[in-house]
Amino acid sequence: MKNKKFLKLVVLLVCFAFSSHAMAQFDLKKAISGAVKMAQAVTLTDEQMSEYVKEYITWMDAHNQVCADDNAYTLRLKKLTEGLGDADGIPLNFKVYYVKDVNAFACADGSVRVFSSLMDIMSDEELLGVIGHEIGHVAHRDSKKGFRTALLTSALKDGVASQGGKLAELTDSQLGSLTEALVNARYSQKQECEADDYGYEFLKKAGKNPWSMALSFQKLKELQGQSGDQLSSKLNQLFSTHPDLDLRIKRMEEHATNEGIEKPVIK
């Protein structure tokens, strides 16, 4: 069906090119090339997606300071995530980036990356809730859909490139463009709420107090509200693409209250 649509598009372009003498300078070769690229983008396969995700996370690991295996941050994360093998069949792997930004993300291949500055402000249970939220996006395939959209609107906006039948490696410029697109990507409010719910249940299954979801969001809100702080500006940029934190906090608090779960005493 997609091939038929593509052929119709090419035929339409050919007809349009010869429909008027006034269009004599219409570049038919360029138009058909653009149609080919568009068709390639639309037919991006799961295998191609996997290759691009692998290339992206490899690039990210190379362009950020990854904490060593014996680093305190790594040891803490390893202890927290011990026994977490997969997310709905997708194998998980974890690393810590030693960076100033407060963030965490998960890729479609199950690669979860936690920033050291986030670990600095979160308790173990709060951090586990955030990780659960990110894993929720992987399990629900939000990460895959978001990556595909970012890929096609940034690094592959001109179509899928290939060399000798294989995908061409993305350039540093393309990977940088992809990173920016992913940072600015927006999950729907429904996707974010479902990921929050996943994180909530994730904490319960781990034997932790699910109130930690609300508490982790509360900490992020407090940081977000700090004025004149470079960290705050980065958080404002980050959460401009997320549903309102107050609403998310309220949802998690109501969820825990309705289940009769006591709010932990904050020391």
Regions found by a protein language model. Give the residues of each.
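Bacterial N-terminal signal peptides that target proteins for export
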Residues: 1-10
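Hydrophobic helical h-region of N-terminal Sec-dependent signal peptides
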Residues: 11-16
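N-terminal signal peptide c-region/cleavage motif recognized by signal peptidases
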Residues: 19-20
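A short, mixed-charge helix-start or loop-turn motif at secondary-structure junctions
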Residues: 38-39, 62-63, 177-184, 238
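Extracytoplasmic and endomembrane cell-envelope/extracellular-matrix remodeling and assembly machinery
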Residues: 39-46, 75, 196, 201, ...
